[in-house]
Amino acid sequence: VYKRQVCNRLLNQPIEDRPSKIVEPRKDSKPFNLNDYDIHKFNPQDRETQKKFYPYFKFRGIDLYTQYAFHRHFCLATKHRTDGLTFANLAFPLVLPMAPDKTVGFEERGRPKMDGSGGYKGKAEGSNSSEGLWIANLTGKPLEKANEIVWFESAYDAMSEYQINPVKMVYVSTGGTPTEGQMRGLLSVTPNARHYLGFDKDDAGRQFVANLRKVATEMGFRHEHVQAYHPLGCYKDWNDALLNKKSAELIAKGEPDTFDYAEFIAAGKAEKQREKEEKNTYHRSV
């Protein structure tokens, strides 16, 4: 609730044109099998296990505290290949909302280049792309009891938004263009939740919002319970907001450049520091 109060200004902002670059798995590939992969997990108590993730998150500005919060919801996955070559990808497990304990695929990101520019982006071979979602439920409650769910086009965007506004909610990534199967699957399990659609602030993202709201209306959701949740100002997506990377295209289109996330994040850190100091002062006085 606090996040929504703080970021209520972000709702229903006007919306740049960006085709999705997610590489979908081949239709003729064999079904996804977790046993085909070697998995390296992030252990919050073991610094050595964390080091391998550094290059995947560094250029995205995603810090260790955010990685700790989401550590159960990502890993490094290396597929067993017949040619003997090995490639580790940052993997975000896809699940079905009705069976959130079974992995049905991966949203994948390759290791970035030395200059930080993007590498491979796609889904693992055989992934259930039509229904599978990355669902990071940080609430400690069953998914069906969630009050607020935030949707994104990528797990990177979800983690970025959390770092800007660290509230333990349900974070969801469609891994590209949202499908009707993904929409109906999650909406059917969470009929009492409010859904915030943090898709990209461009023409495609705006269409994704319209599509999801249409499906939600057909399923009986109240209009105000499914809302757009784009970044304020001239930021295309939530990771750009975290990096304070403004879109020249949005600026050229006349998007009001009235909000600066670097200032917003700095103010939040300063407030936390003040609270910490006040708490320490109180304990010393007692």
Sequence positions of predicted segments:
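Alpha-helical elements of the RecA-like P-loop NTPase motor core of helicases
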Residues: 55, 159, 210
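Serine endopeptidase catalytic core focused on the charge-relay Asp
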Residues: 54-64, 88-95
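TOPRIM fold recognition
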Residues: 163-286
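A broad structural signal for alpha-helix termini and local helix breaks/kinks
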Residues: 11, 61-62, 165, 190
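Short, basic/aromatic recognition patches
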Residues: 63-85
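Phosphate-handling DNA/RNA-contact segment within nucleic-acid enzymes
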Residues: 81-188
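Short, small/acidic-rich helices and loops at N termini and domain boundaries
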Residues: 3-9, 73-76, 246-247
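Non-catalytic accessory segments of DNA primases and related replication-initiation nucleases
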Residues: 3-59
